Amino acid sequence: MSDWLFDLGNSRFKFAPLQGDRAGDVQAWAHGAEGMAGQPPHSLPSGTTAFVASVAAPSLTSAMLDQLQRRFEHVHVVRTSAECAGVRIAYAKPEKFGVDRFLALLAAAKAQRPVLVVGVGTALTIDLLDANGQHHGGRISASPTTMREALHARAVQLPATGGDYSEFANDTADALASGCDGAAVALIERSAQQAHALLGVAPSLLVHGGGAPALMPLLPGADYHPSLVLDGLARWAVHQPAG
């Protein structure tokens, strides 16, 4: 029997075996939580313990937990705490801090260096962690994908997808891609500058999330870590009391 990690996001459901204090090979359902009910039972693993993180709607989270409870002896759902694995969250009310951001910080803290953690999903999240595991707070904005969708919803003639980044675009699709990606990059760069001023040292830049690959060419020196949240969930799992 084995232990598994499950990450239910707003757009994707990912899972991987727990291997030491990290995630093993990751599997993903790109269609997200809504498609879980249509998956055949053998699509999900079974084992001893399931460690679960979810930022999805309560109804979808409940549906996932129902399936996992049929396949695992124990199911543990992560909640953000003020301190875990040497990481101390800056929020006065840690329960208000998103569990995906919390787990990303747990994974990032393993390197024991200042780091700016950037998540690019439905939202763009930016969090600063120092070398001692102290979280210094962060920012939340719309991701480029969400910006495009919002513009299209208000002005249907503006395409929700397509286009390539250009510093000065000469067509609408490219201008939209450039503006939305550029806005995200500008916020990340501003955060990195302010982090340097605060800590006295430039933090490394760690990027994760489904929208991250589109931004990586615009962020020289950044590291892309697609399994960051699952790796953080693994660290959370191994720091739980036995039993």
UniProtKB/Swiss-Prot annotation:
InterPro entries according to UniProt: ATPase_NBD, Type_III_PanK
Function: Catalyzes the phosphorylation of pantothenate (Pan), the first step in CoA biosynthesis.
Binding annotation for ATP: 7-14, 122
UniProt similarity note: Belongs to the type III pantothenate kinase family.
Reactions this protein catalyses: (R)-pantothenate + ATP = (R)-4'-phosphopantothenate + ADP + H(+)
Keyword terms, alphabetized: ATP-binding, Coenzyme A biosynthesis, Cytoplasm, Kinase, Nucleotide-binding, Potassium, Transferase
Pathway listed: Cofactor biosynthesis; coenzyme A biosynthesis; CoA from (R)-pantothenate: step 1/5
Any one GO cellular component localisation term in the record: cytoplasm
Membrane spanning residue stretches: none
Cofactor binding comment, as recorded: A monovalent cation. Ammonium or potassium.
Cellular location(s): Cytoplasm
Database matches in CDD domains: ASKHA_NBD_PanK-III (cd24015)
Domain of life (superkingdom): Bacteria
Reported cofactor(s): NH4(+); K(+)
E.C. designation(s): 2.7.1.33
Pfam families: Pan_kinase (PF03309)
BP GO terms, sorted: coenzyme A biosynthetic process
Organism: Stenotrophomonas maltophilia (strain R551-3)
Residues annotated as the enzyme's active site: 100
Oligomeric form and interacting partners: Homodimer.
GO MF term list: ATP binding; pantothenate kinase activity
Positions contributing to substrate binding: 91, 98-101, 172
Protein name: Type III pantothenate kinase
